[in-house]
């Protein structure tokens, strides 16, 4: 659910700090490039004031999608001849296109995770915005209100165990029975707001990430009172919300031994909350599992959690920036889970400076100097090899995790074509790593015809002797419209002997299956795509995640629900390979 300069989207993918920082010109209806600053308007004469009053159309014009700028020299864009480019728009009746895979089943979001209100005057919309912490709804364009409110119920990531699927949501978790994927059924919903709902499961334990300031220790839906609006002249100042003893930001742990009745057994607080987390199983430790916590949001007040500091390292060597957190979870006593270390994975080993890495300069930062990397967005582990790949905003990291409490950096890379290092996947043999770039934060249209195919793409690296070397890029080949948020996002390997194949979500770009066996020449072998949710305005939707599990592919559709797919034989993938 980082990082674009759009007037409409000054917000990280998953709200996180955005709920505190939310301004009227924030979300969902995206102006794709910053507009030139308008000239100061002259005061209209008295008889012109009525005519100057904005109409609903006028107030939304600022948020209308804009086409991409011309391609930079030497860059190529996406294919407008692909049939995915012109699919009909619609929420549940959009056009569809597929190759090498078929759609098996679809379930709409369960009731607790849907906001059916569409009118900005609906009391439920106002209530939801209040729970999100929106400071001053009166300044928000009226037609934008129900769309922003929908973000409180966005679907996010998946976890699997046995015949159960756990689908995270900004409002909690849905648990499904997938014993028969073609007849997937909802078992229960766990209402527990706080976003973004990144989930993982181990035995009878379910872990969920929470980073938004409306999260409560008791999973209550009432949130907290919005912060008072800033005083005149201080509108641009940003501060963490006032301390609340019942606020929760970190990793929740549930006992799901009774699958229809999950019980929270622990809630481990962290200074920046948990944007994502990664389950780490140590082959040499059967009594504990470990959670790597990636926090990308603001640092909370020390009055709310002792020891939290958002200062730069030069002012406070104990800053909560420039680190990850490690939680140790005793499997037999999860209520005793706690943070046991906060590794400084960005440190300069020569000088000891905590801010030892930077992005090297990025194409979307203009003339800005290289920015220090102070957070990881997501970490992928390969426990059998004792390695982890960290996608850490400005850098891709390779970590030694043989001692899971004290991971050590082996290598770090950056790339001027990358805006925000988002996630990573190892090849099955551990000789390649695929990193993703979430250019636009997942909230912008970044697969338009003139969007370069090296921006918002996968970067495929060789991994040799603990060093990463770039081999190539891969981006969804088909162009997408101005009203479809689209960029590289979450995926997983598909186990085909002798080949490296990954299924991957691209938000409203749909699902693309990539063969990267030859790391220098990746290519698409299957896809499924729907048309945009809306033909005229960019409404956040599409696949957050696409994962292969036991012969099926599951898609977590942000706005619509849950999809089930199967690969089909094609010139790229034989029946024997599918059955292997």
Where are the predicted features?
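Residues at the start of alpha-helices and the adjacent loop-to-helix junctions
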Residues: 8-9, 22, 416
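Bacterial N-terminal signal peptides
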Residues: 12-25
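Feature marking well-ordered beta-strand scaffolds used for ligand recognition
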Residues: 31-580
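Bacterial N-terminal signal peptides that target proteins for export
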Residues: 2-15
């Amino acid at each position: 659910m980082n990082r674009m300069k759009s007037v409409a989207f000054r917000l990280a993918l998953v709200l996180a700090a955005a709920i505190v920082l939310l301004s009227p010109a924030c979300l969902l209806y995206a102006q794709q490039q910053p507009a030139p600053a308008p000239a100061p308007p002259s005061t209209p004469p008295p008889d012109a004031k009525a005519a100057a009053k904005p109409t609903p159309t006028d107030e939304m014009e600022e948020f209308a999608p804009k086409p991409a700028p011309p391609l930079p020299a030497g860059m190529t864009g996406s294919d407008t001849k692909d049939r995915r480019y012109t699919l009909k728009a619609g929420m549940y009746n959009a056009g569809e296109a597929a190759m090498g895979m078929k759609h098996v089943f679809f379930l709409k979001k369960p009731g607790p995770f849907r906001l059916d209100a569409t009118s900005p005057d609906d009391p439920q919309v106002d209530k939801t915005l209040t729970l999100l912490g929106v400071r001053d709804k009166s300044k928000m364009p009226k037609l934008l209100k129900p769309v922003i409110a929908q973000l409180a119920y966005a679907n996010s990531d998946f976890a699997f165990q046995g015949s159960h699927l756990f689908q995270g949501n900004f409002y909690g978790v849905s648990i499904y029975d997938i014993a028969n994927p073609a007849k997937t059924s909802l078992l229960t919903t766990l209402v527990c707001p706080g976003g973004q709902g990144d989930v993982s499961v181990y035995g009878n334990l379910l872990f969920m990430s929470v980073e938004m300031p409306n999260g409560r220790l008791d999973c209550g839906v009432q949130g907290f009172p919005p912060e008072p609006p800033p005083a005149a002249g201080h509108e641009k100042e940003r501060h963490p919300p006032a301390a609340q003893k019942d606020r929760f930001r970190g990793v929740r742990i549930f006992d799901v031994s009774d699958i229809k009745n999950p019980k929270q057994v622990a809630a481990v607080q962290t200074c920046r909350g948990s944007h994502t987390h990664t389950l780490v199983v140590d082959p040499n430790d059967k009594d504990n599992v470990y959670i790597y916590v990636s926090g990308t949001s603001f640092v909370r007040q020390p009055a709310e959690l002792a020891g939290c500091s958002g200062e730069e390292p030069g002012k406070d060597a104990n800053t909560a920036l420039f680190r990850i957190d490690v939680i140790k979870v005793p499997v037999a006593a999860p209520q005793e889970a706690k943070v046991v270390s906060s590794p400084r994975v960005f440190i300069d080993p020569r000088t000891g400076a905590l801010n030892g890495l930077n992005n090297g300069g990025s194409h979307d930062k203009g003339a800005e100097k290289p920015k220090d990397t102070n957070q990881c967005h997501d970490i992928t582990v390969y426990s059998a090899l004792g390695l982890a790949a960290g996608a850490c905003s400005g850098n891709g990291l390779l970590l030694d995790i043989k001692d899971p409490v004290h991971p050590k950096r082996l290598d770090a890379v950056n790339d001027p074509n990358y805006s925000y290092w988002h996630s990573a996947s190892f090849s099955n043999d551990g000789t390649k790593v695929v990193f993703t770039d979430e250019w636009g934060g997942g909230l912008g249209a970044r697969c338009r015809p003139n969007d370069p195919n090296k921006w918002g793409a996968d970067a495929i690296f060789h991994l040799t002797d603990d060093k990463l070397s770039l081999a190539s890029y891969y981006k969804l080949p088909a162009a997408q419209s101005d009203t479809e948020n689209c960029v590289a996002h979450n995926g997983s390997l598909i186990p085909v002997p002798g080949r490296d194949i990954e299924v991957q979500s691209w938000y409203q770009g749909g699902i693309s299956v990539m063969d990267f066996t030859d790391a220098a020449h990746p290519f698409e072998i299957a896809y499924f795509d729907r048309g945009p949710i809306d033909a005229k305005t960019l409404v956040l939707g599409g696949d957050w995640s696409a994962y292969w599990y036991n012969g099926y592919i599951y898609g977590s559709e942000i706005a619509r629900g849950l999809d089930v797919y199967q690969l089909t034989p094609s010139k790229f993938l034989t029946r024997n390979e599918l059955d292997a």
